[in-house]
Curated annotation (Swiss-Prot):
Signal sequence region: none
Organism: Aliivibrio fischeri (strain ATCC 700601 / ES114) (Vibrio fischeri)
Protein's name in the database: DNA-directed RNA polymerase subunit alpha
Keyword hit for Transferase: yes
Coiled coil: none
Region (Alpha N-terminal domain (alpha-NTD)): 1-235
Gene name tied to this protein: rpoA
Amino acid sequence: MQGSVTEFLKPRLVDIEQVSTTHAKVTLEPLERGFGHTLGNALRRILLSSMPGCAVTEVEIEGVLHEYSTKEGVQEDILEILLNLKGLAVKVEGKDEVIITLNKSGAGPVVAGDITHDGDVEIANPEHVICHLTDDNAEISMRIKVERGRGYVPSTARIHTEEDERPIGRLLVDATYSPVDKISYAVEAARVEQRTDLDKLVIDMETNGTLDPEEAIRRAATILAEQLDAFVDLRDVRVPEEKEEKPEFDPILLRPVDDLELTVRSANCLKAEAIHYIGDLVQRTEVELLKTPNLGKKSLTEIKDVLASRGLSLGMRLENWPPASIAED
């Protein structure tokens, strides 16, 4: 089999071996040499870190104020109960968060199947043990908040945002949202006709039961394809930053000379020379102003001092003066 150097083999055989409802092996072959590790490592990382799922994030247990306590009639302490609740495999349809409840009395184990929930919630491991009640008079009641998310979010990451509103007795739980429990891959040799240097990728995956292994592979491949799609067309798609339009002139130059609060004599002399704006004034030199009728050295000194207090001076050069907004007036 000899193809173009620009053509790459695509897997023609995809085999899914369903070991159990939560365990599957997916085999893809043939792959070009090296592509087994390239694709296997990328899919493995996505499956571990980027699969959305649901997890317990908050718990309220009747009669319990903090996690470092115990409850009468319950074999486990509160920390151990919270640890067991982290192992709940919950699937929620159509909602980002739900509240489920657990009420149990009498001696014996308390399991996930004892939890009360509506039709939007499915518990994939109903036999999962949460705690044990030690006598017939013992009882436990709790409200459990389940949220949708991705990856791992420790409870400490939510303390600063929720502490002010969180009432006493509401316990935070580290949330592991990923439905994938274990994932590994192996690359084996594959052969197509005379070629014996090809790869076969075998992905071995276990989930918590809320996500089918085949669907997990499909989602991971979709995420990878969407991320790589940006590299197909390398045009610069950045939104150009809007540059702030700097005014052509300092706003103070556009203000009328009346704003300088000069004496009546000085102000009248400037108006007689058609000097209406501060921008008009700063372009005049001392010699030019002294030629103005009735404007003497005392008035000149006043004008210079007032301009200096505003960071201006006489004899300035202003390109493109006057601006259109003034010229139209």
